[in-house]
Amino acid sequence: MDATELAFTGLARQAEMVRAREVSPLELVELYLERIERIDPKLDAFRVVLGERALAEARQAEGRVGAGEDRPLLGVPVAVKDNLDLAGEFTGDGSAAHRGPVDRDSEQVRRLREAGAIIIGKTNLPELAIFPWTESEAFGKTRNPWNTDRSAGGSSGGSAAAVAAGLAAAGSASDGGGSIRIPAACCGLVGLKTQRGRVSLMPFPEHWHGLSVAGSVTRTVLDAAVWLDAVSGPASGDVDRAEPPARPFAESARTPPGRLRVMVSAKSPIPLVKVYGPAKEAVRETAEVLRSLGHEVIGRNPKYTDVRSSFLPRWLRGIADDANGMPDPERLEKRTRSLAGVGRRIGDRGLRRAREREARMTAKIAAIFDQCDVLVTPTIPHPPREVGRYDGRGWLWATMGAANTTPFTIPWNVTGQPAISVPAPSLHDGLPMGVTLVGRPHDESTLISLAAQLEAEVGWPDRRPPVD
């Protein structure tokens, strides 16, 4: 296996290779550091690369391998989004208004370390993870490895660009309105938005008033499942807790799903949002593959409910809360300060009403799954946008732009149920497109099983972006 092939093998395979002593942790870290130095100047995926620290951790991991330790991610280099606390580093949050270095890891980072992973760097995001593109005044614009004139998506665009370009085995991500699924779709990756409460957000009991969850961007479905097995489970202080799975998620990735009823629809859940031809074609092609695999494919537009009256108050108030928590809020971008000002007008009573609406909306949307086991939609309604599309635009224009990207993603942040974005069978003008599989509440397992079956048929892990 040559160096390039090794860089793209992904999390699960690299963990197997380390256990079998086919490759050493030090070799993996050195490989990725060389690639980051050579390729990341074209992408701006990383806010900071932890070279010396990662090399030291790799040497420690080699000792653990030699001692026979069996940890699921032992010696595998991963990237973490720069809204997670990493002891000894500052958490940038895409902003010049950040505080100084923190003294302890977030719960997700602690669990990654416990599983044996090596943190190779922290990846970029838009300021406070607000928008579905990864561009900030403080840390620059993250570009798509498939076409560097296009966006990597957001807000987990740094992690997605890094994994897609073979700069890390996998990357952490978070999702308050599509921020895992959108960059996964833009960069040709698997993006698993977990069930609310599946992965602890501590030191925050919740984020954006229940909208945000944690997950990953990965090359394969098995990678996503192995990651989830390593980091999932409750922690003291969590507001939400997901029902435990019947079996490990990695086992679901290796188990066929059986024949499922799959509803497919390219109609936007949000009125007046245009769905472009490539997004419709991605759904059509995926439906054909699902049909060939023996599933019952139902072409029907589900009866959604418009979730914006629950989503928007929580999103805006969440931005205000995050801005209020920054040590130097005057250093926030003008657009962020404006959005935070709007959010501060939403009081506790308005928040309670938004959460009450969630319960009614969730009950109505649940009826969709009386007719199917899985719903398939586009992930985003258009191909990846141009980098800098919203430069100089005010908060209202940018928010409208975000709304035109997120109609298929925000409903599932309101309901809290899991969804996974996977690459469509074909590229469009050399760019990836994504489709989203949505499952019943607490049922990542069915989504993982079906997505792995699709992956085996479509073969997206073999694709390589031209940036290398």
Task: Describe these PLM feature segments.
Residues 1-55, 266, 292-294, 463-468:
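An N-terminal boundary/leader segment
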Residues 32, 54, 224, 262, ...:
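Residue-level signal for inorganic ion chemistry
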Residues 54, 64-137:
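Acidic/His- and Gly-rich active-site-bordering loop/insert found
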Residues 73-93, 251-267, 298, 316-366, ...:
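Short helix-loop capping/hinge segments that flank enzyme active sites or metal/cofactor-binding pockets
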